[in-house]
Design a protein with these regions (language model features):
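Extended, low-complexity, amphipathic alpha-helical coiled-coil/linker regions that act as scaffolds
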Residues: 1-385
Length: 385
């Protein structure tokens, strides 16, 4: 009996080393000590049966605490289920290990339900991120087409400004809605070329009424108000980009007050990320660009060095935007791959090396190594008994 107590003491000590000190799992493991001792005393094979129901239950409870690095990581629903299962064992165990097995089965069923919910939630966030990615791709393609026109035709400066702001929205949404191979996209490209041709003519020549109508219609289709669309259309269909109705200042003010398509303040972040990377940051950058989706990270969240665990759910090879979720599939952060690499190089983020073996097995093998060391024997690998 004394040997059993000693072994359990060592086993518990090893398990608790892998669980955060203030994690709820610590209290749950403590509550389980009495029924676990009783089960170990009743079964001579307790320490050698890998799939022993008590060890299975201990592993489930301990592993829940090993991944919760802070209060934000804890899952209230799972914590409630774990607490209920432990209370049931404490109250109902009278020597039948089936009580542990039933409690563990109940928890595992709950875990599978949570995993499905997390998968659905995560998929929703990934779909939204991919939608932003498609929008960004369309914006870049539209901007490239406009820059090509401005370089080749050199329309008046204010016309170029209108093209880059208002007409860019038209091209972007056409690409998103209809696609690059669509007749609508071909029509918009033809209109773009026509705008360049007409506005480059010398002032005083007649307005292209048909072009103005087409431009105004296109702007209305992407959400511009009638007066804005009409004012922009007049300038984009008149030689020299002139308009006697609405002044440049008035139109520029209206456009400045209007939210740009897909503009969420990302430009400043991109400019900041353009700072050259150090060799260490570049090495980390190359590493993160090759990581598979689903890789776990730990981020330092304060000056005390507290950590938060987040999973790299998805990233864009084109823009470098990366989406992070927690265990429940909830979006908890966004980083660019560039900023992520800088955090890693600065010691503020690190990859989590996931253990292949179960926590209970690692704890048991560590216990065995401790016993062998105390007995003056050579340590053995985890694969050995």
């Amino acid at each position: 009996d004394n040997d059993t107590f000693d072994l359990l003491g060592l086993l518990y000590a090893q398990m608790q080393r892998e669980v955060r000190e203030q994690a709820p799992a610590q209290a749950l493991l403590a509550k389980l000590q009495v029924p676990v001792v009783r089960a170990a005393l009743a079964d001579a094979h307790f320490f050698v049966r890998d799939q022993h129901p008590v060890r299975e239950l201990l592993n489930t409870v301990a592993e829940s605490g090993a991944v919760w690095l802070g209060e934000d990581d804890a899952d209230p629903q799972l914590l409630h289920k774990l607490g209920s299962a432990v209370d049931k064992i404490v109250n109902d165990y009278q020597g039948d290990e089936a009580v542990f097995a039933a409690a563990n089965d109940d928890i595992q069923t709950h875990l599978r339900t949570l995993a499905r919910k997390a998968e659905v939630a995560e998929r929703r966030h990934v779909d939204a991120a991919r939608g932003k990615e498609r929008l960004e791709s369309a914006k870049q393609q539209a901007q490239a087409r406009i820059e090509q026109l401005c370089e080749q035709s050199a329309p008046p400066r204010f016309v170029q400004s209108l093209l880059r702001q208002a007409w860019s929205d038209v091209l972007t949404l056409t690409l998103l809605r209809q696609g690059e191979q669509s007749p609508e996209w071909d029509e918009r490209q033809a209109l773009t070329a026509r705008i360049g041709e007409v506005t480059c003519r010398s002032k005083g020549q007649p307005t292209d009424i048909a072009l103005g109508t087409d431009v105004e219609t296109a702007l209305l289709q992407v959400g511009y108000h009638h007066d804005e669309a009409a004012a922009i259309a007049r300038r984009l269909s008149t030689p020299g980009g002139e308009d006697e109705v609405t002044s440049r200042t008035e139109l520029a003010a209206k456009l400045k007050a209007r939210a740009r398509l897909g503009d969420q303040g990302d430009n400043a972040a991109r400019k900041q990320a353009a700072t050259p990377r150090t060799p260490a940051e570049e090495e980390c950058y190359l590493q993160v660009r090759s990581l598979p989706f689903g890789t776990w990270f730990e981020f330092v969240v304060n000056q005390q060095g507290d950590l938060r665990r987040q999973r790299l759910s998805w990233y864009s090879p084109m823009t470098g935007n990366a989406l992070f979720v927690n265990q429940r599939g909830q979006k908890v952060g966004e980083h660019s791959l560039d900023s992520l690499a800088r955090l890693m190089a600065g010691g503020q983020a690190r990859l989590v090396v996931e253990e292949k073996s179960r926590l209970i097995d690692r704890a048991w093998h560590a216990t065995v190594r401790t016993l062998r060391s105390l007995a003056g024997q050579s340590p053995v690998s985890e694969g050995q008994p």
